[in-house]
């Protein structure tokens, strides 16, 4: 699942861009039978009933939304909250503002390599991604001959255009060291694997320079920011 941190900067939501904005995105999980057990639009009434069981919370909610819990107000509230999930002040942010000591020499070399390879062409904007849709298999068979699923169609599932097949929203690179697994199909478990895939399928390189990979990883790790003044941390939730 894509991270919700900095999602407010994305032009579209989800890997396939099926949600035009945060509010549409917020309406997806509640009506996904796999995620929350509901499926039909009428199920918002059941969700509202559960939320109303907490009378104190319901009273507070009505101070902002006098009409109470509805599909519209619930998703609007979630979207407004997600707009606060911004993670500025990463070491790289501080470096760009003039603090030469904010990142290591290897990270600086990695940044120069990032630019040399043209990575910023797609990973652009305040979130360093989320602005465009690109082909996963631009320079090679990303899927490696494996059986493809409907999710592998990418943007085509939304636009119904054959030319959008295998196009996916470029992910943000902010906090990327914490947002594994990578790719739309979670086929890369580490940054090194993700970079290797990009080298091959996006840039068309057959041979991989391990030193360059280490430099790029050093740079990418400087993109981890802060939330409400505290460093963002990656914590694995226990299985239910």
Walk through the language-model features, giving the residues of each.
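Periplasmic c-type cytochrome electron-transfer domains
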Residues: 1-240
């Amino acid at each position: 699942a894509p991270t919700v941190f900095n999602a407010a900067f994305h032009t579209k939501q989800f890997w396939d861009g099926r949600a035009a904005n945060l509010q549409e995105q917020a309406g997806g999980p509640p009506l996904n039978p796999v995620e929350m057990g509901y499926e039909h639009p009428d199920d918002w009434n059941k969700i509202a009933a559960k939320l109303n069981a907490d009378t104190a919370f319901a009273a507070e909610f009505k101070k902002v939304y006098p009409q109470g819990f509805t599909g519209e107000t619930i998703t609007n509230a979630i979207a407004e909250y997600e707009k606060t999930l911004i993670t500025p002040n990463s070491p790289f942010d501080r470096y760009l503002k003039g603090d030469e000591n904010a990142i290591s020499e290897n990270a600086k070399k990695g940044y120069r390599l990032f630019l040399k390879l043209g990575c910023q062409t797609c990973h652009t904007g305040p979130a360093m991604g989320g602005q465009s849709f690109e082909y996963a298999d631009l320079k090679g068979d990303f899927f490696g001959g494996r059986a493809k699923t409907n999710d592998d169609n990418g943007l085509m599932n939304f636009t119904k255009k054959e030319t959008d097949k295998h196009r996916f929203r470029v992910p943000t690179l902010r906090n990327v060291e914490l947002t594994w697994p990578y790719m739309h199909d979670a086929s890369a478990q580490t940054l090194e694997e993700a970079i290797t895939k990009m080298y091959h399928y996006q840039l068309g390189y057959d041979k991989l320079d391990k030193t360059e990979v280490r430099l790029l990883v050093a740079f990418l790790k400087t993109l981890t920011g802060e939330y409400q003044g505290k460093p963002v941390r990656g914590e694995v939730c226990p299985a239910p």
